[in-house]
């Protein structure tokens, strides 16, 4: 396998401490329940991913590595490839070239969208999708990972463990005092937290979050940063965001995309002072 370098020569920061690792096993295979090899501490690995739409190269030999438990921010101008990258990871878009591995052996490019979600990857889009006529508690109940059909889960009594799990997630997303409130009456920020809670009910290992604080108040944005920091470690988070103050509050590694590949990586201060980033992204 080629060395993990993007076309600009930027080595994904997530690999710096694993010099002997040459990437995932070449015999990547379809997911089987309970199987996720994190022996090299990398949960997501994109290897030379390229995607073209009608001659436009949305991704150009993109290489990216995300550590297990990491909180990573992805920034870049419009058209940099951020959404296409998320689409490839979740199976919505098939790459023309390259591989996308979940852990050491699971090749996401060979899986369907439902299989990828079941494997432990959750995605949140910018606009929240919730059941507005049901309470916050009921929304989490519906999202719980159960071997039941949706209509049945509405009427089946929760076990004590299931009730406790819903209650724990409500506290985690700071909606425990809004448990019986119809979701449609929640504020915009609270709706975003509720959808994140619905993802958490699925027990994902990796969360993909697309502009999660768009439209939030300053207070909601601050609380969201605190939530994400608290989730890191148990979960891995990839956050696509334009709000630099929010990115700064998260305090993690930042990857800058440009024209479908990695332009720079580092903490926010480092990438903000990178001359290439200044020229193509910050406009200075």
Locations of regions flagged by a protein language model:
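The feature captures the beta-strand-to-loop junction immediately N-terminal to the Walker
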Residues: 75-77
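Catalytic Walker B motif of ABC-type/P-loop ATPase nucleotide-binding domains
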Residues: 207-211
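Conserved ABC ATPase "signature" region
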Residues: 34, 153-178, 226
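Helix-to-loop junction immediately C-terminal to a conserved catalytic motif
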Residues: 90
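Conserved ABC nucleotide-binding domain
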Residues: 109-110, 169-190
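ABC ATPase NBD Q-loop/coupling interface
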Residues: 99-118
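ABC-family P-loop ATPase nucleotide-binding domain
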Residues: 1-50
């Amino acid at each position: 396998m080629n060395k993990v370098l993007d076309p600009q020569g930027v080595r994904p920061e997530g690999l710096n401490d694993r010099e002997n690792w040459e990437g995932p096993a070449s015999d990547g295979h379809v997911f089987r329940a309970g199987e996720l090899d994190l022996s090299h501490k990398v949960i997501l690995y994109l290897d030379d991913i390229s995607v073209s739409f009608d001659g436009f190269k949305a991704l150009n030999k993109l290489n990216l590595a995300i550590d297990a438990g990491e909180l990573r921010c992805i920034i870049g101008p419009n058209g940099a490839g951020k959404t296409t990258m998320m689409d490839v990871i979740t199976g919505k878009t098939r790459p023309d070239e390259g591989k996308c591995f979940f852990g050491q052996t699971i090749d996401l490019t060979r899986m369907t969208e439902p299989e990828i979600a079941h494997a432990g990857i959750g995605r949140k889009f910018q606009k929240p999708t919730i059941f507005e006529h049901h309470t916050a508690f009921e929304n989490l109940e519906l999202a719980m990972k159960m071997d039941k059909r949706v209509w049945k889960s509405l009427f089946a009594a929760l076990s004590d463990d299931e009730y406790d799990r819903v209650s724990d997630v409500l506290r985690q997303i700071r909606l425990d005092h809004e448990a019986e409130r119809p979701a449609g009456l929640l504020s915009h920020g609270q709706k975003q937290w509720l959808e994140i809670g619905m993802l958490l009910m699925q027990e994902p290992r990796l969360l993909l979050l697309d502009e999660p604080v768009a439209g939030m108040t300053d207070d909601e944005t601050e609380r969201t940063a605190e939530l994400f920091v608290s989730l890191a470690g148990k979960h891995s988070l990839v956050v696509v965001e334009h709000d630099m103050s929010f990115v700064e509050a998260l305090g993690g590694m930042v990857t800058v995309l440009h024209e479908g590949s990695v332009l720079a990586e580092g903490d926010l201060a480092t990438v903000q002072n990178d001359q290439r980033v200044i020229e193509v992204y910050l406009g200075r």
